[in-house]
Amino acid sequence: MTTRIAVTGAGGRMGKILIEAVSLAGGAQLTAAIERPTSSLLGADAGELAGIGKLGVPVVGDLAEVVDGFDVLIDFTAPVATLANAKVCAAAGKGMVVGTTGFSGAEKAEFDETVTSIPVCMASNFSTGVNLCFKLLDMAASVLGDDVDIEICEAHHRHKVDAPSGTALSMGEVVANAVGRNLKDVAVYGREGQTGARERNTIGFATVRGGDVVGDHTVSFLADGERVEISHKASSRMSFGRGAVRAATWLLGKPASRYDMQDVLGLR
């Protein structure tokens, strides 16, 4: 069965990657591409926009206009836009794959309430490698526990607007849950000045922004005499695109619920 996929934010860096990823995937077809109502790209062919040749899918400025033409929406935009798109999808019974990060607490609560009636796969990172890292982090933290200091360092391109990255925060949550802590209670975001000795049982975060770094993440488990590091380095956004399309095809026909890439990959 072919999954009809819509991509929103079609003119953005990730939108173009997603369009290409859909075109390369078996069992998937791009049937809609959406941009802001004021975008100069409206009417352009989505395939030509992504640099892969004509697909016969024009970019439109209103999701509701094409909602009957797709099964699953892939949304890697911004919280406000994702919330608006969620309302349209929920009303029409369409599934969503969401890679948007940077939600405030209120925005996340509103999103969760909006999508209770549809299947949603939401993840901070759709890379297969990163999701394997989540599994490895759970194992490492469960074994090493309170015998180590835990630090998370991430690096991204200069244009990324949220910090730490959603992936870094997800890694922190995996580690915190594995050792029986609440990340909100133990996270330390950056250090400056006379900080004093490191508090045990905390999880530190460090952020780097610059250049065209797609995404680097390293979690260090530091003990006296040794350290264990689990790292992932993305060299292309296509790894995220392939994962998102895989999630979209997996989501077709699933009951209304909240899923993530651990479900898609069978890592639960």
From Swiss-Prot:
Pathway: Amino-acid biosynthesis; L-lysine biosynthesis via DAP pathway; (S)-tetrahydrodipicolinate from L-aspartate: step 4/4. It catalyses: (S)-2,3,4,5-tetrahydrodipicolinate + NAD(+) + H2O = (2S,4S)-4-hydroxy-2,3,4,5-tetrahydrodipicolinate + NADH + H(+); (S)-2,3,4,5-tetrahydrodipicolinate + NADP(+) + H2O = (2S,4S)-4-hydroxy-2,3,4,5-tetrahydrodipicolinate + NADPH + H(+). One of its GO terms (biological process) is diaminopimelate biosynthetic process. The active site is at H156, K160. Its EC number is 1.17.1.8. Keywords: Amino-acid biosynthesis, Cytoplasm, Diaminopimelate biosynthesis, Lysine biosynthesis, NAD, NADP, Oxidoreductase. One of its GO terms (molecular function) is NAD binding. NAD(+) binds at G9, A10, G11, G12, R13, M14, E35, G99, T100, T101, A123, S124, N125, F126. It holds the Pfam family DapB_C. One of its GO terms (cellular component) is cytosol. It is found in: Cytoplasm. It comes from the Bacteria. HAMAP family: DapB. Belongs to the DapB family. This is 4-hydroxy-tetrahydrodipicolinate reductase.
